[in-house]
Amino acid sequence: MSKIGINGFGRIGRLVLRAAIDKGASVVAVNDPFIDVNYMVYLFKFDSTHGRFKGTVAAEGGFLVVNGQKITVFSERDPANINWASAGAEYVVESTGVFTTIDKASTHLKGGAKKVIISAPSADAPMFVCGVNLDAYSPDMKVVSNASCTTNCLAPLAKVINDNFEIVEGLMTTVHATTATQKTVDGPSGKLWRDGRGAAQNIIPAATGAAKAVGKVIPALNGKLTGMAFRVPTPNVSVVDLTVRLGKGATYDEIKAKVEEASKGPLKGILGYTDEEVVSTDFFSDTHSSVFDAKAGISLNDKFVKLISWYDNEFGYSNRVIDLIKYMQSKD
């Protein structure tokens, strides 16, 4: 399997490394100009949300050593200066949140990377959601996007519903856990004034492009979905509320049956299904993109339904980054 590099050792960067270890993928290099190797060891070892790393991690001779495997550490601010080739890294995960366009992310190619996977939505890079549109990938693509955690939750569910019952139109709300871009106390936040309010004190209405992005990965739904977010004071796990008008009438039990069928078949490991009395903490470190909550959804009539699906917005997403890379490697 080709070797992986990670640019940006933040929440997603560190969890992509954990996911890579779980899935037997090889990470050979990490770049982060803001933390040295000893700090990397500390941040990787201890995680307030997902718990202590269960393997071994140490700093040795300037390397980050995880489970006995040496990982080269770079400290470059400009991606063009990262010598990925020297570490053998061919697939680079761009997880700084800064270099999210083809132009900016392509600078990794100068250092020897062959492919770049942006762990965020992109304005112009082709977007992929595992279980939904991987067949649109072609080996000539140098820079791709793994979309957002919310799009990864919504798209598999929307695909099942649209394939079986036809989505005429719909609105999505994600009740979303706090992320690093928010403020611990009230502060300035550019043009997005509400986003600057204290994360621990407030339910904050916010914009999200996640629903519209589904139209990019499922062209049949282009223009049929939009949505918004509420940021809430929890550290992790979010939940999508998808309210849709259907073209083909169906009982809620029929909808549940199709989702459960998909969760055991073509979308196994991507879309989960539960009929238990769950709450958000039950999904900490869950590796699915989306877990349909059969008991939480409701229908007004046979063509108007509200569907609920949970996601670990950090770890589920990080696992999909590795899955996308593995798929790309199988085709390149």
Swiss-Prot record:
Q: What is its main location?
A: cytoplasm
Alphabetized PANTHER family for the sequence: GLYCERALDEHYDE 3-PHOSPHATE DEHYDROGENASE, GLYCERALDEHYDE-3-PHOSPHATE DEHYDROGENASE-RELATED
Would you tell me the protein name for this molecule? Answer: Glyceraldehyde-3-phosphate dehydrogenase 1
Q: Which UniProt keywords apply?
A: Cytoplasm, Glycolysis, NAD, Oxidoreductase
What GO biological process terms are annotated to this protein in UniProt? canonical glycolysis; gluconeogenesis; glyceraldehyde-3-phosphate metabolic process; glycolytic process
Positions annotated to bind D-glyceraldehyde 3-phosphate: 148-150, 179, 208-209, 231
Query: Active-site positions, per UniProt?
Result: 149 (nucleophile)
Catalytic function, reaction form: D-glyceraldehyde 3-phosphate + phosphate + NAD(+) = (2R)-3-phospho-glyceroyl phosphate + NADH + H(+)
Provide the family line: Belongs to the glyceraldehyde-3-phosphate dehydrogenase family.
- List the transmembrane segments: none
Question: Which Gene Ontology molecular function entries are recorded, alphabetically?
Answer: glyceraldehyde-3-phosphate dehydrogenase (NAD+) (phosphorylating) activity; NAD binding; NADP binding; peptidyl-cysteine S-nitrosylase activity
Please tell me where NAD(+) binds in this chain.
11-12, 32, 77, 313
> Which classification does the entry list for the species?
Eukaryota, Metazoa, Ecdysozoa, Arthropoda, Hexapoda
